[in-house]
Amino acid sequence: MSEYTSSFLRVMSERNFIHQVTDWKSLDALLSEKNMVAYIGFDCTADSLHVGSLVQIMMLRYFQKCGHRPIVLMGGGTTKVGDPSGKDDARQLLNDNEIEKNKQGIKTVFEKYLNFGDGPSDAIMCDNDEWLSLSLIHI
């Protein structure tokens, strides 16, 4: 659709990132009116990401370039508990040192594509492993 008013949806459409959108007019209006926040999560099962993650990384990059704030959610907690994602065998569990090494490797990938900091459109990186230590009082 070439009628997008938001720069993000326009770029995504021009680059054929969009297949379908539910209520694109409302989404376009939101993205045009104010800065938005979006996240994508990545498990820490390896010290780098494979090419299958490139679409998500580029979406976050364009999201930021259009003035919005991307969040990279590292799946340290998900990696600890395992997530077979419909596979027949459970994922091999990694120890804390391996997970930390993998997180650092993945972080270097994102630092090539996103600007991290405290500004309104600077990317944030957080880790769902931090949520595992929260008590009900903290939630």
Where is each model-derived feature located?
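Divalent metal-coordination and catalytic microenvironments
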Residues: 12, 50, 125
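Short, internal active-site loops enriched in acidic
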Residues: 129-135
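Active-site-proximal loop->helix
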Residues: 79-100
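A glycine-rich helix N-cap at a beta->alpha junction
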Residues: 94-117
